[in-house]
Structures are given as structure tokens and as C-alpha cells.
């Protein structure tokens, strides 16, 4: 889908911070559209977007290094409000005539600000002399301010923790307002976009729905579209949005790759047939997928195989239907944001996204991606707009490669069936305990490890099942869910008693970072 024009946009210049997406989330939550652009192409992004304000992100880089990232001069020449965060503060000061030095005391974690001076950004939030918690993560620090700036708040280790040039509407902070550990951070960002930049909060999913439908109609015309319906929230919302735009030109195809949760394919088909007048084909391709995946242990190879087979199946089905010109996907904004390396080299790839990494370079259909401007929480709101049942919208995220990446090591039909049963029991216990909505994501993992056990009068040598549950706001950071031991004992007992092939259950207490939510 061609991106629609947004007259009131905030440009976020990304210098390589791990939490730049959180800045965008906070701006969107304030009802304002924004885009993240890497610093290398920020000048082009500035000219293309014609923003009403600019935010400069943090970075692992140091402004003291030769060739370190800089904001394009056009930003400071534009007269627009600018908000610098952490590294963004440092490069703003360095570029405008201030001074940055390597800090004698690196500051990481919780800190407290003392408000030294009234500031327009504090309106309705902070008052003179008040004290507020923030989250620091920096080594370098500003030691001399550019002309026109003054200190408005300090911390014990950061005398220039919050600075402002109110005449030019430049604001800069040494801490991270975008993270949840800065309780008033979201409000500070909201004040910047609304009260400083004067942008209306009219970025809503209702407005997005209308613009997206118009854009889909313009892109597709009278041609046919096949939608890759996985059964997840993203692809389901994409399907309903496209159906609203082009009606019977859309055919949804649900490929059962044999990697879904228990009864998932049947439940998805039933829901769409009962509630929506969609043309839906259910393709059982499990033999084909599992045949190629059997024995494959490398997680990246698994993803590539699954991505390739998905496209092959869709192209084959399109030919059976008489040809389709467009393939629809539920790709989200975090999937398409260009990763940034502040050194100028390639960024480290943690894992390929199944919508991106698995696609072949040559494809016989054009992509329609109506959700590519949205974050996950926005997709859920849009789903409600489109009438998806709350029970469906609130489902835990499920990866495109499915159970293949919850079965580390080589996979087989037997292992998948064992995992599927264990996962179903675990989720059933979570629902019975009334915990499902309190948990961001929960699932079982079948480890490639067998251990000795005793059942009845004999010894067993069976697999270990790991249970995972996390709490999160956005999936970018997560903490393990703190179950009581009675619940864990109950879930483990049911799994061991009811699933042949498992004789030991463990619970994963790793947060993200350092771990990821999924095991592969």
C-alpha cells in the first residue's frame, strides 16, 4: 500500500538507539503521526515528510568520536521545534556551539531531577522545586551550553540534565523520557508535540481506516488480491481492511503449515465463516512444510524455508484461481523500519522477520501491506474499529514460523504434536486462573533434551518442556511473569500426566534483555 500523506508529522531521527521505536510509540499515543528515519537519510526524510517538529534519538555512539552521527543542518535551519534525547542532546549541543565531554561518572538506571526553572514543556506537569524520577543511560555529558540555552532541571550526576532554548523551541534531556521507567516521560513528549509544536492529536485509527481503504482501492484498482491469512491479529485486520476496500476481489488463503497451535486453523476458519462474508480457502500444506523442515535445527534456516514455502503455495493457489496480481501481508511498522548502525556498517541481525527475511527477491505478485505504518497496539485498536471480537483481538502474539521456533533443534511430527498438547494445557490453565489478559505472551517450548524420570514402576527417558510467560507494554522489553508456585505445580503436573513424551517441566525466568521472548 502506498503510504498516505500526513500533514502533521513528527520526524524522529534515529542515531541507533535500541529504544527509538518507543519514542515513536509515545508520539503516536499522543495522537500524532510520526516516522523514524535513520540519520544517514534524515535530510531526505526531512524534505519528504515536511514535519512540524523533530525529535533526535539516543545512540550508543559518542559525539567525541571522529565521524560520529550528526543531525542534518537543515533541521536547525528550519525554525522548527527540536527535542534532543540523550545522544540527541549531546549532538544538538555539539552542533550548536556547546561542549560535550566524556563523563567521569557513567550514569545508568534510575535518577532524580530537581526542577530549577519553569519551562513551557513542564506545563501542567512539573513545578519549580519539584523532584521527579527519570531513567539515565549515558557516559558522555554536556559541559557547556550553546548560546541561548539555559538549565531547567538537574540531577546529582548531570548538571545539564534538562536544558532549553525557549526562543527557538529547542529542548534537550540527558535521560530517556520514552521508557516506562521515566513515569512522566510520555507526558513530556505529549507536551512537546502538542503545546510546543502545536500539532493536533488527530491521528486516530478511525481516520487511518478511511485513508487506508482509499489507498488500497487506488493501488489495487480492479485486480485480484490474495491475503496471507495466518490466523493472527495482524493478518486478520489486514484482511478485513482490504475486504472493506475491494470486496470480492479479495481471496483469503489460510495455509495450515502444521505449525499452528492446537485446533487453531479450524477455529480461525469457523470465526471468519460465521462473522464475515470473506472468500476463504483453507489449504492443508503440512506435509510439504514438515517434510522440508524435518531434521532442520538452525533457526534462521527454518525461517527461510517457511518463508519460501509460503510464497510458493500462494503463487500456486493464485494460478488455480486464475491469477492474482497482489499478495497482502500483515507487515507492521517495526518490521520495515530500517535498522541503523552508527558506524555506517551493517547492523547486527538478531533474527529474520518471517514477513521480510523469508521473501524471495523475485516474486510474481506485488505486495499490499495496509498495516505497514502501524504498531501492534494500533492494529488492535483498528481491529476493534473493524468489528473483530475482543477475544480474538486480545490473543497473545504468535510468530509466523509457529511452533517450528518453539521446538529448538531438529523438528519432527512427533515433537510438534507433543509441544502442541503441552502448549494447549498450559494456556488452558492460564485461562482457568484468570491470568490470560495479565500476561503479554505465554507458550510452551519443547527442549531438545531428554531426562530420566520415574512414572509408575518404571523409568522414563523423555523430553523437557519449558514454560514461558512475560509481561510487557510493547514486546521490546519484557519481564518474566511472577506466577505463584501453586499455579506452576498444577500446570506442570497436568502436562506430565497428560502428554506422553514429557517427564520434566521447567519455568523460564529470563527477562528481555538479555534474553528474547521467543527461544529462537
Swiss-Prot record:
One of its GO terms (cellular component) is cytosol. Pfam families: GATase (PF00117), GMP_synt_C (PF00958), NAD_synthase (PF02540). Pathway: Purine metabolism; GMP biosynthesis; GMP from XMP (L-Gln route): step 1/1. Keywords: ATP-binding, Glutamine amidotransferase, GMP biosynthesis, Ligase, Nucleotide-binding, Purine biosynthesis. It is an enzyme of class 6 (ligase). It catalyses: XMP + L-glutamine + ATP + H2O = GMP + L-glutamate + AMP + diphosphate + 2 H(+). Residues 9-202 form the Glutamine amidotransferase type-1 domain. One of its GO terms (molecular function) is ATP binding. Its EC number is 6.3.5.2. Residues 203-395 form the GMPS ATP-PPase domain. InterPro entries: Class_I_gatase-like, GATASE, GMP_synth_C, GMP_synth_GATase, GMP_synthase, GMPS_ATP_PPase_dom, NAD/GMP_synthase, Rossmann-like_a/b/a_fold. The active site is at 86 (nucleophile), 176, 178. CDD domains: GATase1_GMP_Synthase (cd01742), GMP_synthase_C (cd01997). It comes from the Bacteria. ATP binds at residues 230-236. Homodimer. Catalyzes the synthesis of GMP from XMP. This is GMP synthase [glutamine-hydrolyzing]. It comes from Sinorhizobium fredii (strain NBRC 101917 / NGR234). The lineage of its organism: Bacteria, Pseudomonadati, Pseudomonadota, Alphaproteobacteria, Hyphomicrobiales. The gene is guaA.
